[in-house]
UniProtKB/Swiss-Prot annotation:
One of its GO terms (molecular function) is ATP binding. Residues 367-402 are annotated as: Disordered. The lineage of its organism: Bacteria, Pseudomonadati, Pseudomonadota, Gammaproteobacteria, Enterobacterales. Transmembrane segments: none annotated. Residues 382-392 have a biased composition (Gly residues). It holds the Pfam family MutL_C. This is DNA mismatch repair protein MutL.
């Protein structure tokens, strides 16, 4: 058979094999087009499970007469015009294949009118070349799409359709997912002339709660814990069911959205499951409705033809962010269940970084952050921290008391708490009793030094050196080994016989440092690393560590921890005041001996008296 160009209808039918799996796929594509058109009301009429009729009617902006023929053409879209648009998609649709594919396997009619037009127009495509016919019609502002006799010309596809009830259940599930994504849109679903679902547009929190209960059920609503979590360009909000009360019926409720787009993403599910694993049985699954907002440039939605999957450019960061967000709300729930005498109001608290920060111009938190630090935090996002989430008290129901006030502070503490902490820290003493302090940070000099004032003296502190001592303290085992953080993607490296022998000899010591691995004939697989190494380039650091071990004759955890601390890359090429204050607070807490006896290269006194005297003699 010679090479030839496929007829338009056959090409569209091939594309339909990826986009149009069943009637529910048609409903999803068409309703998403309505939402992209700015519709606030969408009516979905179904007959015989979608096999006979699918009608989608909206009050969106409509389509101009001269664009109707293009709307049914393949690769025609109003969503993108360049590669830059594709790399920052904010609309639900963008491929320009849905209408052409659907019209090739059904009898599709498109009727639309814009606000500028006095009349509506109707378009439909037919024949081998998919020629489009346009004629006048009566229709209000908006668009109606009718899909008749789905798969009428592809009998093999029609045979794979299930029963009418099964196909409608899939459509119902699609509408439920869309209703959870867009609280501001009214959705009406009818089947065989009967109204089955009606989700009215809502704006207030209580109304959103009622829609959540109508879709997910009262049991989920009763156990739902609100999440509002933010760090940088990442925002996580929504609800997760209390794992302690999760039933089999609730485990089917797993809805996740990325920038408003419904997703089935294994990375997100893994992060949520990992956060709940301590409270879920082996046969249980978490129940959640979560919304992840991320910079569109940091996520690729052009992965799957049906747009069910995405690819994150920084998958490890997204995974750990979601894990920490879910874990934090579960820990908040645990704290609220303590006896009343344990949660009585605490005296005014002075956080550990108050001396370094200077005078506090904002409200003091009602409870000590140290009392909220988990024993084994797993998120590593750098020392910057401090990016509290937006307050959810006015946006989402079931917000935990006091959560919004302390969110930014708790998040900073989570980012910085060492993995060796065996128990929550006691409440910090009053400011006057805090003798272990470098002093107050005045400014940053040269990008990597902090100018400090303490007891009337001025000193210059090297922030990279202080960070190295902090990393060494975090990596040095205390009464228990350093907590190992499992890698989402294990690192597999080829090693020599000498390197393998050195690793096996030091395996127990590396385990105390939180580094876990498995070895075979010629390779070693790194499966876990301690918290300070999560954001390091392990493909460079681990081979260098293996080379260092191969050159040693004896091993000690202190020496290995010291080597790692000296060779990890700093996360701050240019330090800010907030980062310096956070670093010093952690160094003062974990390395108090540095305050009493600073090692060489850490502190350098600045002789202000000589400088002042020199100025006086001028």
């Amino acid at each position: 058979m010679p090479i030839q160009v496929l007829p338009p209808q056959l090409a569209n039918q091939i594309a339909a094999g990826e986009v149009v799996e069943r009637p529910a796929s048609v409903v999803k594509e068409l309703v998403e087009n309505s939402l992209d058109a700015g519709a606030t009301r969408v009516d979905i009429d179904i007959e015989r499970g979608g096999a006979k009729l699918i009608r989608i009617r909206d009050n969106g902006c409509g389509i101009k007469k001269e664009e109707l023929a293009l709307a049914l053409a393949r690769h025609a879209t109003s969503k993108i015009a360049s590669l830059d648009d594709l790399e920052a998609i904010i609309s639900l649709g963008f491929r320009g294949e849905a209408l052409a594919s659907i019209s090739s396997v059904s009898r599709l009619t498109l009727t639309s009118r814009t606000a500028e037009q006095a009349e509506a127009w109707q378009a439909y495509a037919e024949g081998r070349d998919m020629d489009v016919t346009v004629k006048p019609a009566a229709h209000p502002v908006g668009t109606t799409l009718e899909v008749l006799d789905l798969f009428y010309n592809t009998p093999a596809r029609r045979k794979f359709m299930r029963t009418e009830k099964t196909e409608f259940n899939h459509i119902d599930e699609i509408i439920r997912r869309i209703a959870l994504a867009r609280f501001d849109v009214t959705l009406n679903l009818s089947h065989n002339g009967k109204l089955v679902r009606q989700y009215r547009a809502v704006a207030k929190d209580g109304q959103k709660e009622r829609r959540l209960g109508a879709i997910c059920g009262t049991p989920f609503l009763e156990q739902a814990l609100a999440i509002e979590w933010q760090h940088g360009d990442l925002t996580l909000r929504g609800w997760v069911a209390d794992p302690n009360h999760t039933t089999t019926a609730l485990t089917e409720i797993q809805y996740c959205y990325v920038n408003g787009r419904m997703m089935r993403d294994r990375l997100i599910n893994h992060a949520i499951r990992q956060a709940c694993e301590d409270k879920l049985g082996a046969d249980q699954q978490p129940a959640f409705v979560l919304y992840l907002e991320i910079d569109p440039h940091q996520v690729d939605v052009n992965v799957h033809p049906a747009k069910h999957e995405v690819r994150f450019h920084q998958s490890r960061l997204v995974h750990d962010f979601i894990y920490q967000g879910v874990l934090s709300v579960l820990q908040q729930q645990t704290e609220t269940t303590l006896p009343l005498e344990e949660i009585a109001p605490a005296p005014r608290h002075v956080p550990e970084n108050r001396i370094a920060a200077g005078r506090n111009h904002f409200a003091v938190p009602a409870e000590p952050t140290a009392a909220r630090e988990p024993a084994t935090p797993r998120y590593s996002g750098g020392a910057s921290g401090g990016n509290g989430g937006r307050q959810s008290a006015g946006g989402w129901p079931h917000a935990q008391p006091g959560y919004q006030k302390q969110q930014g502070e708790v998040y900073r503490a989570l980012l910085q708490t060492p993995a060796t902490s065996p128990a929550p820290e006691p409440v910090a003493p009053a400011l006057d009793g805090h003798s272990q302090s470098f002093g107050r940070v005045l400014t940053i000099v040269g990008g990597d030094c902090a100018l400090l004032e303490h007891a009337g003296t001025i000193q210059l502190l090297s922030l990279p050196v202080a960070e190295r001592w902090l990393r060494q303290a975090q990596l040095t085992p205390g009464q228990s080994p350093v907590c190992a953080q499992p890698l989402l993607i294990p690192l597999r490296l080829k090693v020599s016989a000498d390197e393998k022998a050195a690793l096996q000899k030091a395996q127990s010591l590396l385990g105390e440092l939180g580094i876990e691995f498995q070895s075979d004939a010629q390779h070693v697989t790194i499966r876990a690393v301690p918290l300070p190494l999560r954001q390091q380039n392990l493909q460079i650091l681990i081979p260098e560590l293996i080379g260092y071990l191969a050159q040693q004759t004896t091993f000690a955890t202190v020496n290995i921890a010291q080597w790692i601390a000296r060779n990890v890359q700093s996360e701050h090429p240019q330090w800010s005041m907030a980062q310096a204050i956070s670093l010093l607070a952690d160094v003062e807490r974990l390395c108090p001996q540095l305050v009493k006896a600073p090692p060489g290269g850490l502190l350098q006194p600045v002789d202000l008296h000589s400088a002042m005297n020199a100025l006086k003699h001028e």
